[in-house]
């Protein structure tokens, strides 16, 4: 039975030093079974992304701008998975629900900053495909290792700076009563609702920053793929058009899935009273797990050069 840290009688005097995470309150007896698919997805995400990183690092033929961007995406996926899933599994397996005040806000910062970093990486990769298909002769002079280095710095700095105020503002609130978070993770709104203060500023900043970052990235992604589609439809060689549509189509579908599930999570958090709590919690967990599991498959394993790189590494190991 989960007990809050302070009772109503002393909630105004006893500060909160840790939080308790409650996962799927209506399915407590099913948590061990729920952990099985989550564990498999976690192992898939970690294994696939680690394999992709090692392959790109060790195979000299993959030391190219696009694959460096794939490495960045895999690194972001690994950090996101390690930030969220081990704690969720610890709750399921060992009932370790407590999370310290600093750890909670560190998790919040990583989640809030790394998800926009992923969308920004998708945007740069979409631009890479746009240049490769629409301006193939200029591709080597535009998409260089120096370009990727600058883009990577921009991705990290922009999102870290603009999302840092979210956990900072939330941590500055006073927590002096209920300490049970109705979630598996330290989501900003789930934590803010436990504070004794008005957190309107937090909600406004998260909304503006989140939609500014994600909205601008998604707009540029869709714009890039619009130009790509227009260029592909003009291809005279049918085989080239089919190949380009197959590759870029799978990328676009994955990005669409990523943005859709993120939009659903945001909307369900806003309308949380109309959405079953367990559904809301499940969505919060899955949108940190499914994209990291799918990214290396769609962007990596389906790529001929990546397959060849993995085969070479396996042959060396024999």
Swiss-Prot record:
Cell location: Cell membrane
Lineage, uppermost ranks: Eukaryota, Metazoa, Chordata, Craniata, Vertebrata
Keyword presence, Phosphoprotein: no
Disulphide bridges, residue numbers: 104-196
UniProt GO MF annotations: G protein-coupled receptor activity; olfactory receptor activity
Glycosylated residues in this chain: 10, 188, 198
Extracellular topological domain residue ranges: 1-32, 83-106, 168-203, 266-280
GO cellular component: plasma membrane
Function: Odorant receptor.
PROSITE patterns from the UniProt entry: G_PROTEIN_RECEP_F1_2
Protein family: Belongs to the G-protein coupled receptor 1 family.
Cytoplasmic side: 54-61, 128-146, 225-244, 302-318
InterPro entries reported for this sequence: GPCR_Rhodpsn, GPCR_Rhodpsn_7TM, Olfact_rcpt, OR51/52/56-like
Keyword presence, Disulfide bond: yes
Organism (species): Homo sapiens (Human)
Gene3D superfamilies documented for this protein: Rhodopsin 7-helix transmembrane proteins (1.20.1070.10)
SMART domains found in the cross-reference section: 7TM_GPCR_Srsx
UniProt xrefs under SUPFAM superfamilies: Family A G protein-coupled receptor-like (SSF81321)
Transmembrane segments: 33-53, 62-82, 107-127, 147-167, 204-224, 245-265, 281-301
Protein keywords: Cell membrane, Disulfide bond, G-protein coupled receptor, Glycoprotein, Membrane, Olfaction, Receptor, Sensory transduction, Transducer, Transmembrane, Transmembrane helix
Membrane topology term: Multi-pass membrane protein
Major localisation: membrane
The protein's name in its UniProt record: Olfactory receptor 56A1
């Amino acid at each position: 039975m989960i007990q809050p840290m302070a009772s109503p009688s002393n909630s105004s005097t006893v500060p909160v030093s840790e939080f308790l995470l409650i996962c799927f309150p209506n399915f407590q007896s099913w948590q061990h079974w729920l952990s099985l698919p989550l564990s498999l997805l976690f192992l898939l995400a970690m294994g696939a992304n680690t394999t992709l990183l090692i392959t790109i690092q060790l195979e000299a033929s993959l030391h190219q701008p696009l694959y460096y961007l794939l490495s960045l995406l895999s690194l972001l996926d690994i950090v996101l998975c390690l930030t969220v899933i081990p704690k969720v599994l610890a709750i399921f397996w060992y009932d370790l629900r407590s999370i310290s005040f600093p750890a909670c806000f560190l998790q919040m910062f990583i989640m809030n900053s790394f998800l926009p970093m992923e969308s920004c990486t998708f945007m740069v990769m979409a631009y890479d495909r746009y240049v490769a298909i629409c301006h193939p002769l200029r591709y080597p002079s535009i998409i260089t290792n120096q370009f990727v280095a600058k883009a990577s710095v921009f991705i990290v700095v922009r999102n870290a700076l603009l999302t840092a105020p979210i956990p900072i503002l939330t941590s500055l609130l006073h927590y002096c009563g209920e300490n049970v978070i109705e979630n598996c993770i330290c989501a900003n709104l789930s934590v803010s609702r436990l504070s004794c203060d008005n957190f309107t500023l937090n909600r406004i900043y998260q909304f503006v920053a989140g939609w500014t970052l994600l909205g601008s990235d998604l707009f540029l992604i869709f714009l890039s793929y619009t130009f790509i589609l227009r260029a592909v439809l003009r291809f005279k060689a049918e085989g080239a058009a089919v190949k380009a549509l197959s590759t870029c189509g799978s990328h676009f579908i994955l990005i669409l899935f990523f943005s859709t599930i993120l939009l659903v999570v945001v909307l369900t958090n806003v309308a949380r009273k109309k959405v079953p709590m367990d559904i809301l919690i499940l969505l919060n967990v899955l949108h940190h797990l499914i994209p990291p599991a799918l990214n290396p498959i769609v962007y990596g394993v389906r790529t001929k050069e990546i397959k060849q790189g993995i085969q070479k590494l396996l042959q060396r190991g024999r």
